């Protein structure tokens, strides 16, 4: 019997002349392709596509699907990624014919239902975040970051303040923060984290000056800790003339409990594909709406979706706008799923989401703190970090622990991030997991900790039960093979 590890590439299954699908005979006169397309668009040779049967295709991709791990197949505690369950009612709504069969180029009067839905989503997100207006254009979180920073840049330039070229970013921040700042034309400046895992206010005062355009923060931060001094940080940045930017990657911890706008943030982006259950992974699609306070509204990407006395339309008469940042108006399908989720949960339900996410994370942290080092002992929010320093002294690295978890059927947590925690493991259980699931994962982690003491080679050589063992990750990163060269069959 063929084992899963022997699954061939789809190209390797190809057999010349094998047919997967056939088309009916033409009932009109056949036209040469050259008469239908300009010569520049006609291939000189047929594309080298695999020739396989429908049955082969089904078996091939079914076999591959069994090698995938997703939220629907098991616990996925990937820190800072909010791998929560995506309710299937979202998919039902997203497949309604009246919503599926619209086109962005249809006249506005023909798609009032869809535009009303998008406008209602904007309004809901503005209320949830404490912002004045929201754009749904950005396609993902980093895209939202860049969009927000471009608006901040436009704001400063409109005020003749072109010397503001620096964005302050904590040393525990997501890597997208300094990257987005660079792409937006800023220089990133790092502010230290103190011993409590929070922004060092004294150092923040040192690095903020008349060249500071913005401070980018997640709250809770990437260590899963709430920045309790956030309003003082807002005062520091605002007194210097800068803006406070909220990276909404960790919004799952504060829904219905706290709003960035009330903390002093001027710009917010959200990840609808995370917090609001648009499915994510595999490269997208995502959705990264951006909300702003009133003084930044003129710089929103255009067109701006507005409610004109009950008629929903796109307004392009925005002379100070940073311009369009995406074709059409955002990723419609993900926005629709997020709207469905918000309407399904309601205000009380969204608050319960965050309460349960925080409860689950704290429960796991307290159960595991006796077996792994806990860098920050205070209560966490939606996620927490452990350190494998104790196991490293026994010859077992955090990478080994992550690989060993695969043998138990779990996707490992995020490892070696944030960078300011040695042998870091970042765990985010989300609110959708039961106590039974959490307990099973905890027991696996405890067993691995004991194995590190009693039989470290068992962990060092893991995984033992997966189809693929350890990869040469350096070779894969430096010399990836991203295309298949088909071999010509000889007759």
UniProtKB/Swiss-Prot annotation:
Domain of life where this protein originates: Bacteria
GO cellular component, one term: cytosol
GO MF, one annotated term: pyridoxal phosphate binding
Class of the enzyme per the UniProt entry, highest EC level: oxidoreductase
Its EC number(s): 1.4.4.2
Catalytic activities: N(6)-[(R)-lipoyl]-L-lysyl-[glycine-cleavage complex H protein] + glycine + H(+) = N(6)-[(R)-S(8)-aminomethyldihydrolipoyl]-L-lysyl-[glycine-cleavage complex H protein] + CO2
GO biological process: glycine decarboxylation via glycine cleavage system
Cofactors demanded by this protein: pyridoxal 5'-phosphate
Assigned keywords, A-Z: Oxidoreductase, Pyridoxal phosphate
SUPFAM superfamilies assigned: PLP-dependent transferases (SSF53383)
Modified residues (N6-(pyridoxal phosphate)lysine): 274
Family assignment from sequence similarity: Belongs to the GcvP family. C-terminal subunit subfamily.
Biological function: The glycine cleavage system catalyzes the degradation of glycine. The P protein binds the alpha-amino group of glycine through its pyridoxal phosphate cofactor; CO(2) is released and the remaining methylamine moiety is then transferred to the lipoamide cofactor of the H protein.
Subunit structure: The glycine cleavage system is composed of four proteins: P, T, L and H. In this organism, the P 'protein' is a heterodimer of two subunits.
HAMAP family named among the record's database cross-references: GcvPB
Protein name: Probable glycine dehydrogenase (decarboxylating) subunit 2
Gene name in the database record: gcvPB
């Amino acid at each position: 019997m063929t084992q899963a590890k022997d699954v061939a590439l789809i190209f390797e299954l190809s057999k010349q002349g094998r047919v997967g699908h056939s088309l009916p005979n033409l009932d009109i006169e056949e036209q040469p392709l050259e008469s239908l397309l300009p010569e520049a668009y006609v291939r000189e040779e047929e594309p080298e596509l695999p020739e396989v049967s429908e049955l082969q295709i089904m078996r091939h991709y079914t076999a591959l699907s069994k090698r995938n791990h997703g939220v629907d197949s098991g616990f996925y505690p990937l820190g800072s990624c909010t791998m929560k369950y995506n309710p299937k009612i979202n998919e039902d709504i997203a497949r309604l014919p009246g919503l599926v069969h619209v086109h962005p180029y249809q006249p506005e009067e023909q798609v009032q239902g869809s535009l009303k839905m998008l406008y209602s989503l904007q309004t809901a997100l503005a209320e949830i975040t404490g912002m004045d207006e929201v754009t749904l254009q950005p396609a993902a979180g980093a895209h939202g970051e860049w969009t927000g920073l471009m608006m901040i840049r436009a704001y400063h330039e409109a005020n003749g303040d072109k010397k503001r070229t620096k964005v302050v970013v904590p040393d525990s921040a997501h890597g997208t923060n300094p990257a987005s700042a660079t792409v937006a034309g800023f220089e990133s400046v790092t502010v230290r984290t103190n011993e409590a895992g929070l922004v060092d206010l004294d150092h923040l005062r040192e690095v903020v000056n008349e060249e500071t355009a913005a401070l980018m923060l997640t709250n809770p931060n990437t260590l899963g800790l709430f920045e309790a001094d956030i309003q003082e940080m807002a005062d520091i940045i605002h007194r210097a003339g800068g803006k406070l930017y909220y990276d909404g990657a960790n919004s799952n911890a504060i829904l219905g409990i706290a709003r960035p706008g009330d903390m002093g943030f001027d710009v917010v982006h959200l990840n609808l594909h995370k917090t609001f259950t648009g499915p994510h992974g595999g490269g997208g699609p995502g959705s990264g709406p951006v909300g702003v306070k009133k003084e930044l509204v003129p710089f929103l990407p255009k067109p701006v979706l507005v409610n004109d006395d009950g008629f929903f339309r796109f307004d392009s008469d925005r002379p100070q706008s940073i311009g369009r940042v995406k074709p059409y108006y955002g990723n419609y399908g993900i926005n629709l799923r997020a709207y469905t989720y918000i309407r399904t949960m309601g205000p009380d339900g969204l608050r319960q989401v965050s309460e349960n996410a925080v409860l689950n994370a704290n429960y796991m942290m307290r159960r595991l703190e006796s077996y792994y080092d806990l860098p920050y002992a205070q209560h966490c929010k939606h996620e927490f970090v452990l350190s494998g320093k104790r196991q490293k002294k026994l010859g077992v690295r955090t990478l080994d622990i992550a690989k060993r978890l695969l043998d138990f059927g779990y996707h490992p947590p995020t490892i070696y991030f944030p960078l300011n925690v040695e042998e870091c493991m970042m765990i985010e259980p989300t609110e959708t997991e039961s106590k039974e699931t959490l307990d099973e994962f905890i027991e696996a982690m405890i067993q691995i900790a004991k194995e590190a003491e009693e039989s470290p080679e068992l962990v060092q050589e893991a995984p033992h039960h997966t189809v693929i063992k350890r990869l040469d990750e350096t070779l894969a990163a430096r010399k990836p093979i991203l295309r298949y060269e088909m071999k010509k069959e000889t007759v």
